[in-house]
Every structure is written in structure tokens, then in C-alpha cells.
A protein has these predicted regions:
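Non-globular, low-confidence helical/coil segments that flank catalytic cores
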Residues: 2-342
């Protein structure tokens, strides 16, 4: 009976997905504790220094709640949602959200975005259908104007039957949104059309294949480029998916690496880390989480490569700014032990 119920549930979800699909282009026909008082923000957040050749600014930047630069060129926010992932990219009038943590983190992400004055998300990227990545997305989808929603096109046999995934599909359907397949090699420009030299864009690096037997390896991996700086976001991609990226010939080098799978030893292989060659690594994990993330093996590999490590469990939310030449890090807990030179 249990097997029959599971099969029926899978058929229900698959039927719902196919019912809202555009088969020609694979688009589904559907359509932090950060919620702290501003005084706490002002007290808790401090600026890190420029990496490489950056210099101090002559005048203090315009800020929101005393730590978020309102007039920043490009900002990447690694939002503290506990044991989950949520990253926000803000560039001029464009905003991109990658995941939104567990279901109970949805309101956290919504209020964080609202504190920045965001009304529209030009892109929402659901890296893969695990609850600690897409659980909070329905709240986000229901709270903002949404442009393009990108997710992996998962095979029928791997289609999840969870309530979390059903809530995600329902939220999309309720807003009349369409889900666009993440295809390796696709690029999306967010450049300022008035600046001829602006190269700001993100490229989908993975999933490379369509036959993974672990949802983590279906994760959307993307590379964001702004001027001479770059960022990679890996979802929960594990070493199998990392190897496929390397074999694809894609340029995986980046200044900042969002470490895969919350710092699990199943991700961030030595070969992948060498190819990315980041100056900074950000690990999105919860305090004293039951998985033991990040694993010691991952930290050792990052340390031995002289990579500066930021962690949500130690540093709270991490924001990295780029002016196209240099990057600057801001953390919620500037006195955290992980905020010293590695």
C-alpha cells in the first residue's frame, strides 16, 4: 500500500508539472533572524577590507541600516537562513534571488528583500527541489513581482513528490509564472544598456547531464561576471556534478565561491577548487546543525588553498560588494572568530 501511495503521489506531481508545461522549450506553464531591529543591524555589522588593490573610499557610502551600501555597484548577499541556502544579487535596478531556505525562512527572506526596497525580482533561481533551498520560495513568489524563474529540468523518475515541491508549483501557478529550464551554456545579461563596456551577466554551468540519481547533482550552478570580478554559486552540487563541469570545458574560475552543499565533504573536490581558485569562500550553514556542516575536510582544503572563509553560522549574513575591479566583504558579526585572516 505504501508503495502504491508513493507511486500515486509521484504521478500526481508529474501530472501537475506536465499540465503546466511548454514542451517545445520546457517551461512549466506556471506562471533571519535578519528580521532584526535596525538598531541591531547598526550595532552588529562592520566592513571588511578590500582585497588586492582596493582602497578606502573618500566619503562614507550611502547606506541602509548603517551597513548595507545603498549605492553599491554590485552586491551579493549571502542571507543567513540557518541550515539552508539563499543568495541575493543586486546590480543597479536588477535583482536576482537564488533559493530561499526552508519554509520557515520564507518570511525572513521576504523581509530582508523589503528592507532593501526591492519590489521586483528579475530572476528567481531554484537550484534544486530540496526543502532547504526552495522551501521559502513560495512566500517570496507571493510577495514580489517576479520575472523569470529558472530551475533544473529533472527527469520524471527523479521528480519529487514532497509537499514542499507541490507548494512551489502552486505558488508559480498562482502568479501565472512560467518555469524556464536551466541549460548549461545559457547566459543572461543584466548589463546596463547605457554602458557599452558593461559585461555583467550570469552563465549557467550546470546541470551538464540529465541522468543524475541524486537531486543534489541536478543543482543549477551559475557564474556571475561583473567587470574583472566573478562569483560562482553551486547549490548542493557534489563532486560528480563538479567533475562534469570541469569536463565540459566551461570557465569555472571565480573570485568568490559559494561552497557546495553547505560545506559537505561530498562537494568541493580538490580539482574543482583548483579550477575555481577563489580568494573567498562562503559557506551557508546553520549553527550546530545536525549534519556537522561544514565538514573538516572541506575547511582543510580551503585553508590549504589560502581561501578566506566566511560562514553564516559564524558571521551571520555575508555581503560582498564588487566595483568590477575589487571585492569588499561585509559581515553581520565582524568579531566572529572566522573573520580573522586564515
Amino acid at each position: 500500500m505504501a508503495a502504491k501511495r508513493k507511486t500515486a503521489a509521484k504521478r500526481t506531481v508529474q501530472k501537475a508539472a506536465k499540465k503546466i508545461a511548454d514542451p517545445s522549450r520546457w517551461k512549466f506553464g506556471i506562471t533571519f533572524p535578519i528580521v532584526l531591529i535596525l538598531i541591531l543591524f547598526a550595532a552588529a555589522f562592520v566592513y571588511g577590507g578590500y582585497l588586492e588593490s582596493g582602497t578606502e573610499e573618500d566619503e562614507p557610502p550611502q547606506v541602509v541600516s548603517n551597513f548595507i551600501k545603498k549605492d553599491a555597484d554590485l552586491a551579493v548577499h549571502y542571507i543567513d537562513v540557518g541550515q539552508g541556502d539563499s543568495s541575493l544579487i543586486v546590480y543597479k535596478d536588477k535583482s536576482i534571488l537564488i533559493d530561499a531556505g526552508e519554509r520557515d525562512s520564507g518570511s525572513t527572506v521576504v523581509e530582508y528583500l523589503q528592507s532593501l526596497g526591492i519590489e521586483k525580482l528579475d530572476y528567481v533561481i531554484a537550484t534544486h527541489p530540496h526543502s532547504d533551498h526552495i522551501g521559502g520560495l513560495p512566500d517570496v513568489i507571493n510577495s514580489f513581482e517576479i520575472g523569470t524563474v529558472i530551475a533544473p529540468r529533472i527527469s520524471d523518475e527523479m521528480t519529487p513528490t514532497t509537499k514542499t515541491y507541490e507548494r512551489f508549483l502552486t505558488a508559480l501557478s498562482g502568479k501565472g509564472l512560467r518555469l524556464t529550464a536551466a541549460n548549461a551554456g545559457d547566459t543572461y545579461s543584466i548589463a546596463d544598456p547605457d554602458i557599452e563596456s558593461d559585461n555583467t551577466e550570469f552563465e549557467i554551468l550546470a546541470p551538464v547531464k540529465n541522468d543524475y540519481d541524486d537531486l543534489n547533482n541536478w543543482s543549477v550552478v551559475l557564474k556571475l561576471v561583473h567587470g574583472g570580478t566573478s562569483f560562482i554559486f553551486t547549490g548542493d552540487a557534489e563532486q560528480s556534478a563538479e567533475n562534469d563541469i570541469l569536463d565540459s570545458g566551461a570557465d569555472g574560475s571565480a573570485d568568490v565561491l559559494k561552497v557546495g552543499h553547505h560545506g559537505s565533504s561530498t562537494s568541493t573536490s580538490k580539482a574543482f577548487l583548483k579550477a575555481v581558485s577563489p580568494s573567498i569562500a562562503v559557506i551557508q550553514c546553520g549553527t550546530d546543525n545536525s549534519y556537522g556542516h561544514p565538514h573538516a575536510e572541506t575547511i582543510e582544503k580551503l585553508d590549504s588553498s589560502n581561501v578566506k572563509i566566511y560562514r553564516n553560522d559564524y558571521d551571520g549574513t555575508v555581503i560582498i560588494y564588487s566595483d568590477g575591479k575589487d571585492i569588499r566583504a561585509v559581515t553581520e558579526k565582524g568579531d566572529a572568530k572566522q573573520n580573522v585572516d586564515n
